[in-house]
């Protein structure tokens, strides 16, 4: 019985240590989430402005008839996917949702590896796809908690350049969209070619009319459209990172709560075992006393 009590006590102490670790990780993820949410809000100021400029320009008659490849659809022979996962685990179902969505998409729409190209951001996704012999063209590992454009700009530019060079004919970003601290949604968002933009982004009094573009429209579009697309992709990365921190916080909170429940159950088990041991000792003492009479 003493050995059993000792084992239960050791389990309680071990679980308490685990609970302290998961609680600390929860607080760290919570702090990261607050920073990421603020970064997302700050970026939206820039994203909204460039989206408005691009929308106004494309809805004007200044660019009608442009043959810019970023605006023109072509027969789809190959599709590019930017897939955003985490670099580490302990984030609940964050990665599994993305990887399942990608596998379903590839199974449904592609029969050969040459039909698609994956640009992987995050070690979990890179390892997953490579282990299955899938077509990973580029990868980025070790993404910062609050990624700067300098860190991700190169791989984003590579993706846009691959489309412009017709290495694939359309480009999607697959990521977890942050809804709130408890919820995220998988998004498969088309980036290229640029589709019809939201009419609400351009009001009647803002649509460009009666202006000339200098030096010419093609030069303007050549500069603006990649910048616009890259900003959308960067925004998706920030959004995904925010969802990752939220998932990490929720996972660690769940782990902490589960540890507390285990501790409570073990404590009850320990007290019952201790009570049984005491009762057994009293019974033995009484029996011994009776034997001496």
UniProtKB/Swiss-Prot annotation:
Source superkingdom: Bacteria
Database matches in PROSITE patterns: ATPASE_GAMMA (PS00153)
Gene3D superfamilies named in the record: 3.40.1380.10, ATP synthase, gamma subunit, helix hairpin domain
GO MF assignments: ATP binding; proton-transporting ATP synthase activity, rotational mechanism
Membrane topology according to the record: Peripheral membrane protein
Cited SUPFAM superfamilies: ATP synthase (F1-ATPase), gamma subunit (SSF52943)
GO cellular component: plasma membrane; proton-transporting ATP synthase complex
Chain's role: Produces ATP from ADP in the presence of a proton gradient across the membrane. The gamma chain is believed to be important in regulating ATPase activity and the flow of protons through the CF(0) complex.
Family: Belongs to the ATPase gamma chain family.
Self-association and partners: F-type ATPases have 2 components, CF(1) - the catalytic core - and CF(0) - the membrane proton channel. CF(1) has five subunits: alpha(3), beta(3), gamma(1), delta(1), epsilon(1). CF(0) has three main subunits: a, b and c.
Name of this chain's protein: ATP synthase gamma chain
């Amino acid at each position: 019985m003493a050995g059993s009590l000792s084992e239960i006590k050791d389990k309680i102490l071990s679980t308490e240590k685990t609970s302290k670790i998961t609680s600390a990780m929860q607080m760290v993820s919570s702090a990261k989430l607050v920073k990421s949410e603020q970064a997302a809000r700050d970026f939206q100021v820039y994203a909204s402005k460039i989206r408005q400029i691009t929308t106004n320009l494309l809805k004007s008659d200044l660019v009608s008839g442009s043959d810019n490849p970023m605006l023109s659809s072509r027969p789809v022979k190959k599709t590019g996917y930017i897939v955003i996962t985490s670099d580490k685990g302990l984030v609940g179902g964050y990665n599994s949702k993305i990887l399942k969505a990608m596998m379903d998409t590839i199974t449904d729409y592609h029969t050969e590896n040459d039909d698609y190209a994956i640009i992987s951001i995050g070690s979990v996704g890179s390892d997953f796809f490579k282990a299955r012999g899938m077509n990973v063209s580029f990868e980025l590992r070790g993404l910062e908690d609050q990624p700067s454009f300098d860190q991700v700009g190169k791989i984003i530019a590579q993706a846009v350049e691959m489309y412009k060079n017709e290495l694939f004919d359309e480009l999607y970003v697959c990521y977890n969209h942050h809804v709130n601290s408890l919820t995220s949604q998988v998004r498969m968002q088309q980036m290229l070619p640029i589709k019809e933009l939201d009419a609400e982004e351009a009001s009647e009094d803002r649509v460009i009319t009666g202006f000339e573009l200098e030096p010419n429209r093609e030069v303007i579009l050549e500069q603006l459209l990649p910048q616009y697309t890259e900003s959308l992709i960067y925004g998706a990365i920030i959004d995904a990172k925010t969802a990752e921190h939220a998932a990490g916080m929720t996972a660690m909170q769940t782990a902490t709560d589960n540890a507390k429940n285990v501790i409570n159950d073990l404590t009850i088990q320990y007290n019952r075992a201790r009570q049984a041991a005491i009762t057994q000792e009293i019974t033995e003492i009484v029996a011994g006393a009776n034997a001496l009479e």
